Amino acid sequence: MNWRRLMNRPTDFSKQGYPVFDISCTPVITKSSSAKFMAPSPDAMNFIATVGDDLIYLSSPYTSGGTVDGDEAINRVESTKKMLFTLMNMGIAVFSPIVSGTGINPYGEDKGHSWWMHWDLKMLRKCDRVAVLALPDWQDSLGIQMELELATILQKPIFIIKEGE
């Protein structure tokens, strides 16, 4: 499928009624040591049981209204890294195009949105499920809209993940 066709199919995915999981972990200190570990919330445990060994595509917004705001983009990347680490720490196999892309972008010239979406959508095809990190204004992200459209066409299960407190 040509990714450009996905851009011309606007759908309001915020009203689709996807399952929502509040992924939060609580720091726990054991009696036998001062070491802390993160105990997953009941909702996080339900998410683990739901996805099993599936490979998750973690979709998250990078731009705001189609433009990159430097500080906001940095905050979104950091929030995505935190969620990526949380999910991996819970034993979930997960891929994040934002973390992957921002990690390698300094090694070449800026390729632009269409170049990145080409590779992101290739990776989405390889994943079993799509989870959207519900950062502010995620519904307005063109990239997320395209990812959800392709996931819907491919009949991949879609989840919304809220950042835990």
Give, region by region, the residue ranges found by the protein language model.
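Conserved catalytic or regulatory cores that recognize and/or transform ribose-phosphate-containing ligands
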Residues: 2-165
